[in-house]
Amino acid sequence: MFKKKEISPYSVEDKVTFRNVDKTITLYVRGDAASYVVGLKKAQDKLSEITGESNEQERVECARFFARTLFGDDQGDQLMDFYNEPLAVITVCGMYFKDRLSKKITKAQKR
């Protein structure tokens, strides 16, 4: 009668809360480890193009791409609106990836 939701053994799921002064936002990560690897490689390439001479629009586009890669389009946009500063978004996304998500992706790939 009811179909069980099939969960890929390579899926990555997480919940993360970000704080900014007196505000908080909770975002959810759900996706396939392999697709994260591909998306994060593209994000890394975009991040490497940012220099001190990059204009604000380039920084915003890069930060938005990184956030969308990690959290999906809607939640990535919410994170951009939450911080309203591209370098802050790049920083928190980088810290989250380094501290938690990379370990979850590696674990999912070993299954």
Which residue ranges define each predicted feature?
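Short, charged/polar N-terminal "headpieces" of proteins
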Residues: M1-K46, A108-R111
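Short, surface-exposed, charged amphipathic helix/loop patches that serve as local interaction elements
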Residues: A33-R111
